[in-house]
A protein has these predicted regions:
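Short hydrophobic alpha-helices and adjacent helix-cap/hinge residues
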Residues: 1-324
């Protein structure tokens, strides 16, 4: 009887020990894959993304692990880097440019992808903004609205603007998104010359062609390739005294006349919201893609002076930042 009781006690102790061991096992730490184009260019935005994640309780190295993979301007590496993240079995992939979103989309149909691009429907990433329908969701902005505003602001800066060159690269989203700029220009009564660049050496040829055609300004279409080679572009714009509306604030800091764009720091913060939803079990197919509500209009007054442009006060008052 005593022997049987001892065995029962031992069995109970073993069960309790097993239960404690199970409870003591650490919870699975979510792993986020970040597929980026350029670590230097996106450093500020990544910091904003991480800061917002902390507000949701996610701290890199403690409550989450973020696996970064950077192409550093080499688009041919994106497929390999996306495959690495898939092999790591990350819980979600975050990415923010058409080429990198495309690479992630091709690498997996099951791992959720949180992205930000312009015109995700036109580029085939989602079926609809309200119901994406696949494994991709995030934040997006529409070319048509931004293009019209950018051209209108450039027209306010350049008197009698009737001819404009549009600089583009296919890796920025393709011709479909360039058409939005063309349509916006025609709406404003502006003639358009399309100039595609594929290699760094194409910039000088393109700007020379724009000047020969009689372009009074240039609109730069969003493109990771152009961003990578922006110094070449900005040098050519300065040498040819051509006013331009560029893609990002960084261009304006470095010498472009102006930019009107969604506030990308705020967009990257917003991506943390989507990551939180997914880590809590939401399906990307059911998470509506939202559109930014905050935009920045940055003007370089020094560049305007070098171009001989007297920017009207009505234009400067619209700016969120004036670089002097």
């Amino acid at each position: 009887m005593i022997h049987r009781r001892a065995l029962s006690i031992m069995a109970a102790v073993c069960l309790l020990a097993t239960a404690f061991a199970i409870n003591a096992q650490p919870a699975k730490v979510p792993r986020i894959g970040f597929l980026g184009m350029d670590s230097g260019m996106q450093a500020i935005r990544v910091a904003a993304f991480q800061d917002e994640l902390r507000k949701y309780g996610y701290v890199d190295g403690r409550t989450i692990v973020i696996e970064y993979r950077w192409a550093e301007g080499r688009f041919d590496r994106l497929a390999e880097l996306a495959a690495e993240l898939v092999a790591l079995k990350v819980d979600v992939i975050v990415t923010a440019a058409p080429p990198s979103v495309r690479a992630a989309q091709r690498a997996t149909t099951t791992i959720p992808i949180v992205m930000t691009v312009h015109d995700p429907i036109g580029m085939g990433f989602v079926g609809a903004l309200a119901h994406p329908g696949g494994n991709i969701t995030g934040s997006a902005f529409q070319d048509s609205e931004l293009s019209t505003k950018r051209l209108d602001l450039l027209r306010q800066a350049v008197p009698n603007l009737t001819r404009i060159a549009i600089l583009w690269n296919r890796e920025g989203g393709g011709y479909a998104s360039v058409q939005a700029v063309e349509t916006a220009a025609r709406t404003l009564g502006i003639q358009v010359l399309l100039l595609e660049v594929k290699e760094p050496g194409d910039f000088a040829t393109a700007i020379a062609a724009a000047k020969a055609w009689g372009a009074q300004g240039l609109a730069q279409h969003a493109s990771p390739f152009i961003t990578k080679n922006r110094k070449i572009l900005l040098d050519q714009l300065a040498a040819n005294r051509l006013p331009a509306s560029c893609e990002l604030r960084e261009y304006v800091v470095e010498g472009c006349l102006m930019t009107y764009s969604a506030d990308l720091n705020m967009i990257f913060r917003r991506l943390a919201y989507f990551v939180d939803l997914i880590l809590k079990g939401a399906k990307p197919a059911d998470i509506p893609i939202d559109q930014p509500k905050e935009f920045e209009f940055v003007v370089n007054q020094k560049t305007a002076q070098s171009l001989g442009l007297a920017l009207p006060s009505s234009l400067l008052l619209q700016a969120t930042e004036v670089i002097r």
